[in-house]
Amino acid sequence: MNALIDADVHITWQDSNVFLSYLPDAWKGRFTQGYGHSETGFALSQPFFNPLEAGRPEGESDPDALLQWMEKTGTTACVLHNWRAPAVGNFGDTIYPGHLAEAYNRWLCDHWLSRSPSFLGSIVVAPGDPDAAAREIARAVRACPQVVQVSLTPGTLEPYGKPRFRPIFRAAAEHGLAVCLHAGAEGVGVCNPPTSHGWPRNILEYRVTPATNFIAHLTSLITEGVFTDFPDLRLLGLEVGGILPLITYLWRFDKNFKALRSEAPWLTELPSAIVRKHIRLGTHSTAIGDPEVYFKLLESFGADDMLLW
């Protein structure tokens, strides 16, 4: 029997004081006052993009409830995320978010991963200090073997292919972890607006743009040679706008690479081949019209095995 793994299960805490206990005393005041608080500090994250009514914490904060659901549905394992946590990468400073990331990772290990071997962890790091982020990856893996992934915010000031981010990808590759870009923190904090033309006025506009941010990072990671440097590295895109936008994107990427490959002489494969080898995308169960047409589109560029649930 094949394993059924849910790659994107959202978790949180019901009481922020539980998380607060993992922060050094010097930073607790900043957390409780809301300057960087994961629930209220980013004013944009709740009233504009994520209304409280969209998801109550009760269902996301009970490990026993998740285990019961897994048994009922036949789910073998779950990769656990806190959708707010990657926003530690959206601060203007680099010290406080590093402490937030470590606090979250310790909380994840103690309150969830220790409860069941079926729980797998997606830790977070603060990419503003890549060397510190790499050290946190090593610490978290040593502390908790059920860590399988590093989550990064797709909302940044620079694309992730830039050399300054190499320590993060090196650490992930050395420890056998996937790297995940999970949509949801674009335009939060000090990062760029969530669209290339600035700020949208409503959630409708925002919800149709995550693919553009993911594609920008993906183009940078491929062109700058990250997957050449780390041939075993895997990148996941979760809630980033689906796989179908990649079809026309990869056609154009391959086309331009053939004409401009002298700018990236370290690449020995077409971008589409690199994507098929290194990239996986999450999807949700949803009505897709005619499944036969859908799967023909996936097969058209060899993506029929790129989807995660």
Where are these regions (language model features)?
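Helix-coil boundary/capping segments in enzymes
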Residues: 1-309
